[in-house]
Amino acid sequence: PASHHDFGKNIIPANIERSRVFAFPFKDENRKRDAYWRDVGTLDAYYDANMDLVSIDPQLNLYDSAWPIRTHQPNLPPPKFVFGTQGDGERTGAAIDSIVCSGTIVSGGRVQHSVLGPSVRVNSYAHVSDSILFEGVQVGRHARIRRAIIDKHVQIPAGFEIGYDLEKDRARGFTISPGGIVTIAKTEDLSAVSASESLTSALSEGGIRQPFLHRSNPGVPNAGTRSQDTT
């Protein structure tokens, strides 16, 4: 429980104490850069490391065949981008300056400068920018996400906004990093948050009336009410 699960603070020191540890100088004089190492122990550092991946010349080039990434490859189809309706420029499935993993479908939504994990779904008219979406995240129609980290399988309701009003996000109980990155945990039920906000908005605007009955004449039932059957 006392561990931060951090390489520098916990993992490497613990291994040095109980095992024989050897250092390897990851440096190749024939390469233009030293080997990649980056501390991602904070939300802001993790966010910056991911945003670097989508830059034109990232420090860690995932597409460098001379330095392959050995990892599990899920058995999923390639990403798909659908809807490019003429005359409706907003409904165009597109991803720009982004990394999109297998199984993801951008269906009439727009993704900019973001990293999308496997099996993400971005629905029509939604806009995702400068964000990291983990596996299985579902983004509803007209939703807007900016400078956020969304954990696995979170469902973003239609029209929901994240990252556009930090005070509102903070009031929702979301974690916000010192750099202003909004983080949504996989346990968050955003549908309940959306429903609560919609109800509060309707009440403040007088759009919902209290369900009570009023009779101006005790002898005559009001229109729309049901009188008791005495037969």
Model-found features: residue ranges?
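Left-handed beta-helix
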Residues: 1-231
